[in-house]
């Protein structure tokens, strides 16, 4: 079955979502963010995840929060989001504020553990690949 083309709601910024300035950065973030912890891994279907993300975006929720270990299996939330990003949200990338985190043991050996520079650099590279992104807004 071919997915219908997603077109964001034209009134997504006029539906009542409030935005607040984040610290001294000047960036405006919605009062509600969408955290993709346990609900966007291999337990949920891609279509169910896509429906939830599209609905949130259509309501003005533009801040998506992930981490390298989110999902029932590590990295699966980022992978699922990456598929959705590639298939339907890519035209809206500049309207999205995407964050991800590292800090969990993700692979064997001395370099896959907590917060060494090597671990963090490898973690962001892997996260970007899983999400089909060139950058994130906060890491």
Regions found by a protein language model. Name each.
Residues 80-84, 97, 101, 119-126:
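Generic beta-strand or strand-like secondary-structure segments
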Residues 88-117:
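Structural motif corresponding to the early beta-alpha repeats
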């Amino acid at each position: 079955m071919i997915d219908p083309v997603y077109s964001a709601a034209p009134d997504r910024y006029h539906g009542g979502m409030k935005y607040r300035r984040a610290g001294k950065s000047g960036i405006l973030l919605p009062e509600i963010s969408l955290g993709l912890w346990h609900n966007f891994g291999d337990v949920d279907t891609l279509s169910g995840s896509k429906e939830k993300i599209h609905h949130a975006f259509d309501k003005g929720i533009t801040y998506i929060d992930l981490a390298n270990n989110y999902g029932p299996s590590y990295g699966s939330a980022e992978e699922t989001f990456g598929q959705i990003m590639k298939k339907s949200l890519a035209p809206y990338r500049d309207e999205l504020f995407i964050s991800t985190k590292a800090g969990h043991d993700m692979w064997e050996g001395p370099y896959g553990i907590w917060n060494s520079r090597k671990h963090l650099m490898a973690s962001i590279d892997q996260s970007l690949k899983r999400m089909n992104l060139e950058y994130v807004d906060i890491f």
